[in-house]
Amino acid sequence: MEKQVQIPEIELNSGHKMPLVGFGTCVPDPIPPLEELAGIFLEAIKVGYRHFDTASSYGTEEALGRAVAQAIETGLVNGREEFFISSKLWCEDADLDLILPALKKTLGNMGLDYLDLSMIHMPVRVRKGAEMFNYTKEDLLPFDIQGTWKAMEECNKLGLAKSIGVSNYSCEKLTKLLENATVPPAVNQVEMNVVWQQRKLLPFCKEKNIHVTAWSPLLSYGAVWGSNAVMENPILVEIAASKNKTVAQVALRWIYEQGASFIMRTFNKDRMFENVQIFDWELTKEELDKIQKIPQRRGTLGEDFIHPEGPIKSVEDLWDGDL
């Protein structure tokens, strides 16, 4: 049997354990054919990944479900319980009456009885059937933070999601949610990397015992929509050279040292191994201080959800000024 990576776990506030590195399944259009995509995910399973992160908006739930089923059928893993599968409900389903049916649809897409973690993708609601990222004023609808969370709690109570969480929530939106929550979010999955270090949100979530997972830890370097701001950052390049590590390893180790987990996507088998070789070495205080001085800028502003006459009138409203 080929060598497998070993990834540590964290216990969430729900009592369930989650591997600290998730394999991301968001792929650029055109999405590869189902069997090809399932084969890539199966390769990641062979490498040792067990935490897989998807979303209804990615169009990859079925392929991931196929890979999980094949891994179980072929004896690559002992059973479903070896996996930690997370998915996110899109904005068109961010309504009290739509969340449960949407989660059931996700489970049907993947051929699963439950998710390990179900999240609300954005604190935003759009009209059902609206063209994604081409929203009109009429498509943008009021979002009920507390009502949608009650529906998530019902999914948890029914056993359809062992843990429930959110994505892209600010401190202020989490505070509003928690005012009326019976079950607190286990996870807040947010943009986090060395050029957007979440200096306000991270300590807030730690105080509330909500685990932070970083998406875009390398700013999607190499993708059409990506940026070189992390991978070509001169401070990281210098640290990587001095430690005989890759820039990606330094950037990912930094996230781990902040107490956060991260979602990584690569179809390159060598990088599947390389990206998790970060747990047996440390950054020095001097190196951490240098990273702390990197200028900060949020990469994703969410302008698609903004309209001067809509529920969210500015990016400042969406992120509650944390820009």
Swiss-Prot record:
SUPFAM superfamilies membership: NAD(P)-linked oxidoreductase
Top-level lineage group: Eukaryota
Residues the entry annotates as binding NADP(+): 53, 167-168, 189, 215-220, 289-297
CDD domains linked to this entry: AKR_AKR4A_4B (cd19124)
Pfam families per the UniProt record, alphabetical: Aldo_ket_red (PF00248)
Catalyzed chemical reaction(s): rhazimol + NADP(+) = rhazimal + NADPH + 2 H(+)
Listed pathway(s): Alkaloid biosynthesis
A GO term, aspect molecular function: oxidoreductase activity
Active-site residues per Swiss-Prot or TrEMBL entry: Y58
GO biological processes: indole alkaloid biosynthetic process
Enzyme Commission number, as recorded: 1.1.1.440
InterPro entries on file: AKR, AKR4A/B, Aldo/ket_reductase_CS, NADP_OxRdtase_dom, NADP_OxRdtase_dom_sf
Entry keyword set: Alkaloid metabolism, NADP, Oxidoreductase
KW NADP (keyword) present: yes
Temperature remarks: Optimum temperature is 37 degrees Celsius.
Site note Lowers pKa of active site Tyr, residues: K88
pH sensitivity of activity: Optimum pH is 7-8.
Function, in words: Oxidoreductase involved in the biosynthesis of akuammilan monoterpene indole alkaloids (MIAs) natural products, components with various biological properties such as antidiabetic, antibacterial, anti-inflammatory, anticancer, and antimalarial activities. Catalyzes the conversion of rhazimal to rhazimol.
Assembly and interaction partners: Monomer.
PANTHER family from the UniProt entry: ALDO/KETO REDUCTASE (PTHR11732)
Family: Belongs to the aldo/keto reductase family.
Protein name (record): Rhazimal reductase 1
Organism lineage: Eukaryota, Viridiplantae, Streptophyta, Embryophyta, Tracheophyta
Gene from which this protein is expressed: RHR1
